[in-house]
Structures are given as structure tokens and as C-alpha cells.
Amino acid sequence: RTAMIGIPGAWDCHGGVEVNAPQFESFFGALDALMDHLAITPGQSTRWLIDEVVVVAMSEFGRTPLWNGAGGKDHWPFVSAMVAGSGVRGGRSYGATDDGLIGKKVDYRSGSPSDTGDMLGTENLGVALLKLGGVNPDRFLPGIQSFDAILRE
């Protein structure tokens, strides 16, 4: 099963981002309420539903790490994601940026920066999530390497 939650509003704000504060409060409040609810709701095969569910929070694109001249942030090819729940190796950050704030190559098994690694993309995360859900990723994302660093062994 899959559920998707959207917080309405104009998120694509290149200036005056303070107008997004209520949206962030709504989003993180809803996320907090969801996690709390999962932690006290009986699961189907485990004691609590949080032990059966994976929650992913991300956007389809990133934002520049520095402010632009209009007090906002522009589109950026690097994005962050929060992944929590069953089967996920949590409590850490993966990847890195260089001094110019450009994403570095990553070892897909450890999640650490590596000169011999590859650039991490949303498709690599998608393959890992499909594997976590017991779905063969080759059917949907053939030839894409899995970002296994997020998977609990």
C-alpha cells in the first residue's frame, strides 16, 4: 500500500521565502502526527504499524544552498530526502558536497563519499525502496543501481 500527503500552496518561491513558514509548519506537523499515529497503531504482522511502514519525504528538485538576491532559493540539481521506518538504516546522513556545494560521488553500499562511487540520484533511492517493498526493481527501473546504504541488513 502507498499513501501520499501533499501540503497545498506555492512552494516554488524564488524570493521572500518567509511566506512558506506556515506551509513548513503544516508539513512538519502532519509528518510528526503521522509518525506518532504509526507508533501507536497496531500493525498487521508486527506489534506497531511503524514497524511495517516506510515514510519518504522529498521534493522533485532541490534548492540552492545559498540565498539569491531576492531572498529566496532557486532550483538546484541536488535534493535531500528523509527516509524513516521499517527496514531503513536510520539515524544518519548520506552523501556530501564539496566546497562549492556540489554533490560528491557516493559509494552506494556505505553512503559515504567516494571518488570511485557514482552520483546519487532519486532513481537509486527508488530502486532501494522497491527492493525494500519486495518488488523486483528491474521491472520498473532496469539497469539502475540500488542505494543499498539506506537498507537495514
Language model features by range: what are they?
Residues 10-153:
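Feature marks hydrolase-like catalytic cores characterized by long aromatic- and Gly/Pro-rich stretches
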